[in-house]
């Protein structure tokens, strides 16, 4: 293609691999792929390559896996490729200023939110957690800050009432490559525009923790239902009963208020296990006891009905 760019791609998980896949058929020249070192995974803790490495090797692309880009000898790996631009998608390593400045057109990043909202590690999950009605992807020119660079392209996406982090991840994994290719086309043609982020609109998407996934019945049912969707597929919301954790994969909000303390079981049948909250009732419909697969409320009641006697407290 005319205006073909020499591109370094840097990314690690499946989300990044979908962007590399789009680049492979774009006509641009991929001169190198950076991804995190192989990690132990699975029951045998066998060293496992990242999805980006697997795809890159299938297409015989040079792969680099430094543990850090701070040492000068690792920075030379980038410089020696003489790239026009570096595309960074969920790479997981910090790029020092020296590296950001090496490609002729700098480095661009695909971020899973409409910046400046939700800078940081968990933008997809936090948009659900906060009850946002819209999210999207932002392509930005990278600088040394945390997602602070100038914005070059945005694509918005509605958040549906039944979206989970898994479903939203899939939507953004389709939008991201579109935005990336559009931005690269504009950069190649010299028509790319840059918009400074409005610092007054910044919010931060803190990393998720397993502790945060514990359901706090002193919150409103609406907020707890958002947590269930935001923490699916990880770390998965849960409560404990008889000192055993029970994960909650799906839940709905019942608008009526219960005349009971938060955490009290109101009713349990095939339609769900109803629990009182600070405001409204949370109806648990898909659950997973320790050591079992996710199951319907009915299946759990068949084996553990004594746990969910109305009046019991979770």
From Swiss-Prot:
Signal peptide: none
A Pfam family that the UniProt record links to this protein: Formyl_trans_C
Keywords: Protein biosynthesis, Transferase
Catalytic reaction(s) noted: L-methionyl-tRNA(fMet) + (6R)-10-formyltetrahydrofolate = N-formyl-L-methionyl-tRNA(fMet) + (6S)-5,6,7,8-tetrahydrofolate + H(+)
Coiled-coil residues: none
Enzyme class name: transferase
Keyword Protein biosynthesis: yes
Transferase is among the record's keywords: yes
EC number: 2.1.2.9
Origin: domain of life: Bacteria
GO terms assigned for molecular function: methionyl-tRNA formyltransferase activity
Ligand binding ((6S)-5,6,7,8-tetrahydrofolate): 113-116
Record-level GO cellular component terms: cytosol
Annotated function: Attaches a formyl group to the free amino group of methionyl-tRNA(fMet). The formyl group appears to play a dual role in the initiator identity of N-formylmethionyl-tRNA by promoting its recognition by IF2 and preventing the misappropriation of this tRNA by the elongation apparatus.
Entry similarity comment: Belongs to the Fmt family.
Protein name (record): Methionyl-tRNA formyltransferase
Species annotation: Serratia proteamaculans (strain 568)
């Amino acid at each position: 293609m005319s205006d073909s760019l020499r591109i370094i791609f840097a990314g690690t998980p499946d989300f990044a691999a979908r962007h590399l896949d789009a680049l492979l058929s774009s006509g641009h020249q991929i001169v190198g792929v950076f991804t995190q070192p192989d990690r132990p995974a699975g029951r045998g803790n066998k060293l496992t390559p990242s999805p980006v490495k697997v795809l890159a090797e299938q297409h015989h692309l040079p792969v680099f896996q430094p543990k850090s880009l701070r040492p000068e000898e690792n920075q030379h790996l980038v410089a020696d490729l003489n790239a026009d631009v570096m595309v960074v998608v969920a790479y997981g390593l910090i790029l020092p200023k020296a590296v950001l400045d090496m490609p002729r057109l700098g480095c661009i990043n695909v971020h899973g939110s409409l910046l400046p909202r939700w800078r940081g590690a968990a933008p997809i999950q936090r948009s659900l957690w906060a009850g946002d009605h819209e999210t999207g992807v932002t392509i930005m020119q990278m600088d040394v800050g945390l997602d602070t660079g100038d914005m070059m392209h945005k694509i918005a996406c509605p958040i549906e009432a039944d979206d989970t982090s898994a479903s939203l991840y899939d939507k953004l994994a389709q939008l991201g490559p579109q935005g990336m290719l559009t931005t690269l086309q504009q950069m190649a043609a010299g028509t790319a525009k840059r918009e400074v982020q409005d610092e007054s609109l910044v919010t931060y998407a803190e990393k998720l923790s397993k502790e945060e996934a514990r359901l706090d019945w002193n919150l409103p049912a609406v907020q707890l239902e958002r947590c269930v969707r935001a923490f699916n597929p990880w770390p998965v919301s849960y409560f404990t009963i008889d000192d055993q954790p029970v994960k909650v994969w799906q839940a709905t909000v019942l608008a009526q208020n219960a005349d009971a303390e938060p955490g009290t079981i109101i009713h349990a049948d095939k339609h769900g296990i109803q629990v009182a909250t600070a405001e409204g009732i949370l109806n648990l419909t898909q659950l997973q006891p320790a050591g079992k697969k996710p199951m319907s409320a009915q299946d759990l009641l068949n084996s553990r009905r004594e746990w969910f006697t109305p009046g019991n407290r979770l």
